[in-house]
Amino acid sequence: MCIRDSITINDGNISVTASDDGFNASEGSADDDAESSGQNIGKGFGDVSENCILNINGGYIYVNAGGDGLDSNGVMNISGGTVIVDGPVNDGNGALDSGTEINVSGGILIAAGSSGMAEFPSDTSTQPSLVVGFEQSLDAGTIVCVQNKNGENIITYSPSKKFSSVIISSPDIIQGESYSIYYGGSSSGTAKDGLYSGGEYSGGTLLETVTAESAVTQAGTGTFGQMGGIGRGGMPGNNGSFDPENGEMPDNGFTHPEGMTP
């Protein structure tokens, strides 16, 4: 676990395995955070501060966390590099957690974990993100693959733990373009920390095809607690999602993906 009020990563190859938070930009101490482990109460939670900043400008970062994967009590900025978060399996934590907002402007971001406190990138982010939700948790090692309209793999990833949500952002996800999200199946590529390169993806089940209409676009039928941060990230657009502001469900309800039941 790395706890400092301000954390900036510009380069390097970093791998973190933590029973609690992976990176935590907080004014609290390690002892404070240990006392709030799994509950995110006390000094590690709620004390929003403009002094707390987590900047990722480059490098390769892999985080396997039992608590929040990336946590900032202020702003989180991701502008480059490759960031992979194998986040929590419990709904009391999130793969990403900020006090105010998460700004994504570049790089590759993959953050998998539970859905109860999943936080999305801000709607002011300049690089689009797909927020993929599953109504039931999927087993560790289940592949999630995003393909563009030409059937080319954009991201092929398999978390190391069970998960019900994945946040994916990449320079190859372009606003206004359509993308198909598959789960299951297999890949002949080479995996590092669950992220596949090269090879062919096959045998998966189509979850949904969506258009990246805004900074954050939701796919799938999973619901999100959206309780992680104080300021919260952006709310996902379209695709039959619950409208928490107005307390409304879509008229036609949710469409359950093939092979999954309510």
Region roles according to the model:
Residues R4-P262:
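A composition-driven surface/loop motif
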